[in-house]
Curated annotation (Swiss-Prot):
GO terms for biological process: L-arginine biosynthetic process; protein complex oligomerization; regulation of arginine biosynthetic process. Regulates arginine biosynthesis genes. The keyword Amino-acid biosynthesis applies. It is found in: Cytoplasm. PANTHER family: ARGININE REPRESSOR. One of its GO terms (cellular component) is cytoplasm. Pathway: Amino-acid biosynthesis; L-arginine biosynthesis [regulation]. Belongs to the ArgR family. GO terms for molecular function: arginine binding; DNA binding; DNA-binding transcription factor activity. InterPro entries: Arg_repress, Arg_repress_C, Arg_repress_C_sf, Arg_repress_DNA-bd, WH-like_DNA-bd_sf, WH_DNA-bd_sf. This is Arginine repressor. Keywords: Amino-acid biosynthesis, Arginine biosynthesis, Cytoplasm, DNA-binding, Repressor, Transcription, Transcription regulation. It holds the Pfam family Arg_repressor.
Length: 156
């Protein structure tokens, strides 16, 4: 087998394992890949692959912290899976703040950014699990807060 074929097979197996959303550590991924026949795999290679493919740690359906791959490269739309990532929405006189599951803030912020000024969003800043949203001058923070809560079906 050519080296490029081996690499392609490794990438396919790696992505398939992460889609299972059951691996909480890099060591678990290494062991699973070894069971798939990739004898020369190690933790540092898995770490590089996680970074290369933009993997994040988030909670699965069993509420376990696991590695997973971002599902969409384009601008995401609101779906039930995005709604589940929003843990809390709050606001003050200046900002609306969203708390998400670990690693989910960037994904949700990109979706909010795509809504833009037409929805009253002047700007969005996201960290790993926190998003700050600033309203435009044409909307109050309270109105933006209510819109964001509706968007994510957040009852708060």
């Amino acid at each position: 087998m050519r080296p490029s074929e081996k690499q392609d097979n490794l990438v396919r197996a790696f992505k398939a394992l992460l889609k299972e959303e059951r691996f909480g550590s890099q060591g678990e991924i290494v062991e699973a890949l070894k069971q798939e026949g990739f004898e020369n795999i190690n933790q540092s290679k898995v770490s590089r692959m996680l970074t290369k493919f933009g993997a994040v740690r988030t909670r699965n359906a069993k509420m376990e912290m696991v590695y997973c791959l971002p599902t969409e490269l384009g601008v995401p739309t609101v779906s039930s899976s995005l709604r589940e990532l929003v843990l809390d929405v709050d606001h003050n006189q200046a900002l609306v703040v969203i708390h998400t599951g670990p690693g989910a803030a960037q994904l949700i912020a990109r979706m909010l950014d795509s809504l833009g000024k037409s929805e009253g969003i002047l700007g969005v800043v996201a960290g790993d699990d926190t998003i700050f949203i600033t309203p435009t001058l044409t909307i109050t923070t309270e109105q933006l807060f209510k819109s964001v809560c509706e968007l994510f079906e957040y009852a708060g």
